[in-house]
Amino acid sequence: MKNIILCADGTGNQGGYTPDSNVFKLYNAIDLNSRDPEQICFYDNGVGTQSNKYVRGLSGALGFGYKRNVRDVYEYLARHYDPDDNVYLFGFSRGAAEIRAVNGFIDACGLIDGRGKGDKQLKDEVKKAMKVYARPPKREALLGDIKIHAAPPAIAFIGVWDTVSALGFPERTDIKGIGLRMLSWLLKLVGKLADALWPHKFYNYKLTPNVTKARHALSLDDERTSFWPLVWDEDTNESKPVDVQQVWFAGMHSNVGGGYRRSGLSNAAYLWMLENIRGLVFKKDTLRDAEDDANVNGRIYDSRLGFAIYYRYHPREISKLCKDANTEVKVHESVLRRLRFRTANYAPKLLPESFTVIDNEGITTASPPVHSEHWALFNKGIKRWIAFRKWLYGILLELTLGVLIISTYLWSTAKGPLDVKADTNDVADVLYYITPEFFEQLIYITVVRDPVWILGATIVFSLFIAVRMIALRKTTRYAERLRKLIIRSPLAHPDYPVSGSPDGATALNLDQAESPPTIDAPQEEKL
């Protein structure tokens, strides 16, 4: 009997070349010299790690190579699996979706017995089985004489960090503005075309009966629609329930799964995962090093900084996500610590008024519920300003599309290449240097020939930035008021009496209570 550990990394994550993700850290922490039990490990780079920058960009955006990655992980398991082996699956981001898809592959088709088979034979059989995965009603006819293990392998543990949609484009219904409607329509069209050319909607990301234990670390604070999380539906309707915990951590997507250079915050989610794993043998001092490196007050990066501002803006709706997945909202105790310390003025925007606090060791804080008559008002204010910021994003998108359309027209109707040295100024020279040739005609007209245009554009852009900053401050102000309600509750204080709990959780409800905190309610604000 041996342990087989399969690891799949996130988009753009390449172990040893990019800052370490939690998946790569765990892969490196496995003791491959262990003989009791024997352990073997497979690591798969994330999509979007090719050497060619254009292929890398397309793969990162559209998930090219995902199907091959799923086959590679399945093939490795098929080649090395013996009955009674323990299988462990780990992934981050799209790699988390990949690992979950591999488990769905096993559930749909079983596991091919690849022992003693040549590379080509096994690859061909896995490709054939993938077709069965896509069309399960025809399983027996398509599999033919491929030898399948009598029973699917039991998955001892599946651990994932912030699973996001692997292929296609997450759709949101609260679209603001013409630009966003056009973008939504375009992405829906591209998604349908991509599914027709490279079918992907057949992948099964659900929990299956062969899984013994499952853990999912999720990001509280990411604001990108493209990184919308795939939360497990915990209502599996199976006679044998899965031991599953899905826990929310402070920070953006890569603050939870790793990949930023300053990794203190992501190490908190890494440590939580390590302390939930049973049966694996790690290298000496792995747990101690993880404890030393974890920093709940570490830096939270801005996931929409720079050109990333063009990611569709949509903070995560924690309550709705958990309700749809038939699970309660579980927040890691490190979030409460960060709130209590007010680190970098941290205040999550869409925490529900009732949630469960959970720690690494199964210890809970026995606290009375805390009442807030102002919670609904503060929450309403946050949602109103979030809606306004979505509208601002729509304006930005429409203005950008307008510039691109005008540039396309001017560039396509130009009689010849522009002699930028004939008539120019310092501003134009800088713009010529930093922008593609595609924009030369537009720059000449708006900066050199009629500079009033660049002056007007500068004023409009400055106003946009100012309004955006005001909206951000307003959203943050309401979030800070919600934070004040939380940190005034006994649950947020480390010296409050604690007690053990079988599931390591305790409920915090801000809707009922013994004595409400005194907090000034803000007046209703209009946009």
Question: What do the PLM-derived regions correspond to, one by one?
Answer:
Residues M1-L527:
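Active-site- or binding-pocket-proximal scaffold segments within functional domains
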